[in-house]
Amino acid sequence: MKVSVVITLAVLGVMFVWASAAELKERGSDQRDSPAWIKSMERIFQSEERECTKFLGGCSEDSECCPHLGCKDVLYYCAWDGTFGK
């Protein structure tokens, strides 16, 4: 019983690899299209300058955090500084 299960799984694995290789050959390699796709999505990968770091965002000093937030010394994130008002 165990041998038949192992043989069945092996055959299914070989069929999967064979079908994947045939599909890749039919469609062509995705690696040729990758650089164009990355260039079109370039703005996503660029870091944006923001006015201030919002709640739980990373920081190195208090001036980077938005109003009423301060930079915590231990994990360096912006958290509420306990103040209220506009």
UniProtKB/Swiss-Prot annotation:
Disulphide linkage map: C52-C66, C59-C71, C65-C78
Expression across tissues: Expressed by the venom gland.
Annotated propeptide span(s): 22-50
Modified residues (Phenylalanine amide): F84
Major subcellular location class: secreted
Signal sequence segment: 1-21
Localization: Secreted
Alphabetically ordered keywords of this record: Amidation, Disulfide bond, Ion channel impairing toxin, Knottin, Secreted, Signal, Toxin, Voltage-gated sodium channel impairing toxin
GO MF entries: ion channel inhibitor activity; sodium channel regulator activity; toxin activity
Cellular component aspect of the GO annotation: extracellular region
Function comment: Inhibits both peak current and fast inactivation of voltage-gated sodium channels (Nav) channels. Inhibits the inactivation of Nav on DRG neurons (EC(50)=1.77 uM) and peak current of cardiac myocytes (IC(50)=0.90 uM).
Free-text note on domains in this protein's UniProt record: The presence of a 'disulfide through disulfide knot' structurally defines this protein as a knottin.
Family: Belongs to the neurotoxin 10 (Hwtx-1) family. 37 (Jztx-31) subfamily.
Protein name in the entry: Mu-theraphotoxin-Cg2a 3
